[in-house]
Regions:
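HhH-family (HhH-GPD) DNA N-glycosylase catalytic core used in base-excision repair
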Residues: 1-262
Length: 262
């Protein structure tokens, strides 16, 4: 077993970041247990905890995965270099956001372990509850074994509980990655331009991915029902107007509004 550490910038609201992950877990792949984020990679296991006294993430890696690659992925997933001072100072000006920032200073968008995995999870979650999306992801894992483009293309996804168009969108996404049509190492604007031409990647989906994959600090899915509910507005237009003073950090504002435990 390998045990490593990752230094993080304070403030680092581990409990709230863990809550975000717990609410969106992929069954059989991830779990949150007693303050630890656990991820399985085939037969291997990664566990992450946070030591508040030293401001370090403690990472346990068992199996044959490369520890350096795991540490890099965790660092990106949790954006450990995020400097909260400027962002939180701006968002505290909002009466709506001020109490949320006070309760979880340093909250930032959670990234992704795998761009493909998050893309699939986002398509699956369209127009369904978080609980329903979790159930569908469980079925996908059961059918595919491992959520990679190769396994998704080869899997039988018939009668999995999703509309046929959504299943085809997932398959098209997998094929585009295998063909090299999508390259997540390219600048996000280039990636977004490709996604825009593909089925299943409308404005909401692309804005959400811009937050979590593109690290666009001002991306904002203004049609999101959860954001409208948290902001106490009824329409996307009202939400856009309300969010205007939050620029250029609307993605962080969205993250505070999405947090279910604030």
């Amino acid at each position: 077993m390998f045990v490593g550490e990752i230094c993080v910038r304070r403030p680092f609201p581990w409990t709230h970041l863990l809550g975000y992950l717990a609410h969106r877990l992929i069954p059989q792949v991830e779990q949150v247990d007693d303050g630890m984020y656990v991820r399985r990679i085939g037969a291997d296991r990664v566990g992450v905890t946070f030591d508040a006294a030293s401001a370090r993430l403690q990472v346990e890696v068992s199996g044959h995965v490369k520890p350096t690659a795991v540490l890099a992925r965790i660092g990106r997933l949790l954006d450990v270099e995020h400097d909260a001072s400027v962002v939180d100072r701006r968002l505290r000006r909002s009466p709506l956001l001020r109490p949320r920032v006070a309760r979880a200073p340093g909250l930032r968008p959670v990234g992704a372990w795998s761009p493909f995995e998050l893309g699939v999870r986002t398509i699956v979650g369209q127009q369904v509850s978080v609980a329903a999306a979790r159930t569908l992801m469980h079925r996908l894992v059961q059918r595919c074994g491992v959520l990679t483009p190769e396994c998704v293309v080869a899997a039988n996804l018939h009668e999995i509980g999703m509309p046929g168009r959504r299943v085809e969108a997932i398959r098209s996404f997998a094929r585009a990655l295998l063909d090299g049509h999508i390259d997540f190492d390219r600048p996000w604007l280039e990636v977004d331009a490709v996604l825009k031409q593909m089925p299943g990647f409308g404005p909401w989906t692309r804005a959400y991915l811009a937050i979590r994959l593109g690290r666009d600090p001002d991306a904002f899915p203004d049609s999101d029902v959860g954001l409208m509910r948290a902001a106490h507005v009824a329409t996307p237009t009202e939400l856009r107007v309300l969010a205007e003073p939050w620029r250029p950090y609307r993605a962080f504002a969205a993250t505070y509004l999405w947090a279910i435990d604030l």
